[in-house]
Amino acid sequence: MCKGCNQQVKQKELIIPIGPHRGDKIITNYGCICEDIKLAEETKHALYSLKRNRLIDNFNYYSLINNSLKQATIENYNPTSIELNKVKQKVLEYINSFDGEQNLLFTGNCGTGKSHLSISITKKLMEQGYKCLFLSLPKLLTKIKRMYNKGGGIEDELLDIIRQVDLLVIDDIGSEQQTEWSTSKLFEILDDRAGKATIYTTNLSSSELKKRVNERNFSRMMENTEVVVMNGADYRRRDF
């Protein structure tokens, strides 16, 4: 019995017929699959690394992120109050129990880490193999407008990615310039995300946000959405 693979093993003595070791005797194990198991594990690890790298490459290519957020992680988020520490724990629970359907709305004053925690969630979920995307809504709408001059193909590609990812973060919603076109485009995005996990961040209150994005979009946003309030000191200026 092989201790490595728990398979019945038969040992046979063979004589090397040719080469510099001709005539030497060797003992071989028949039935041992340790090398097969090792190869399978190495292949599995290589495929996982390839998939994870591809997810990260796509995330970096399609996401619209401020440079200040690129190094953000759940580990380097330092809450400035007991309440914000509770929010950090809630985020960890969300990551550990991610079901692909539950939405979050981070709301509160500037500088409490809404965007920091949101992008941290995407990084942790990508480690688990989920497809994620982080988009600043004002930047997204600006980019889509520019795409009109280059033909609809590029816009369609981006909207397809938005539709397909397991988690979409829409950052800074409500701060975009409000026009009939932007309101319609936001509804299109929200409609495409129906039934899929989306995280929203905003500095606005619920009444202010409803007024900014209109009642129809606000109602669609709030479907299966947990509101997470993040008020406190601006952690980016804690040393100022």
Residue map of PLM features:
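Short glycine-rich substrate-engagement loop in P-loop NTPases that contacts/grips substrate
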Residues: 82-91, 101, 122, 126-164, ...
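Loop/turn-to-beta-strand initiation segments
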Residues: 102, 130-131, 164-168, 194-200
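A short, basic N-terminal segment
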Residues: 1-80, 84, 227-228, 232, ...
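Surface-exposed cleft-lining segments at the edges of enzyme active sites
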Residues: 78, 107-108, 143-144
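A short mid-domain helix/strand-loop element embedded in enzyme catalytic domains
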Residues: 66-71, 87-103
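Walker A/P-loop nucleotide-binding motif
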Residues: 100-118
